[in-house]
C-alpha cells in the first residue's frame, strides 16, 4: 500500500483528501513508513470522522485535518521523531519533525 492508495481510500469513505508530494531530497523507507503509520494513527484517533486531510511532503511533512472534535496534542514518535500540533481554523496542523526541531507557523 502507498500514500496514494491511502489517499484514495480516504476519498472513498468521504474524506476530502489531497496529497502534495514533492520532497526536496530522497525520503528513506523508514521515514515513508513512519509517515504512513502517523497518518493511520491520526485517522484512528479521529475515528475516521474527518472532513478533510491535506498531506504535504516537502522539506517538512505536514498533515492538515479538519472536521474533528478530537483534540490532538504534540507528542513523541518512534525513531527520534515527534508530532508538533497547531490549532488552525476548523482543525489542526500536525507536523512530523525530528525530535528537538520546531517549525514556526
PLM features: residue spans?
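Short beta-strand/loop element within the Bergerat-fold HATPase_c
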Residues: 52-68
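Short, hydrophobic/π-rich interface segment
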Residues: 37-40, 65-78
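Helix-loop-beta hinge of the Bergerat
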Residues: 2-27, 31
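Solvent-exposed beta-strand sheet faces enriched in polar/charged residues
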Residues: 20, 54-56, 84-86
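Cytosolic C-terminal regulatory domains/tails of membrane transporters and channels
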Residues: 48, 52, 63, 100-104
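Conserved ATP-binding N-box helix of the HATPase_c
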Residues: 26-54
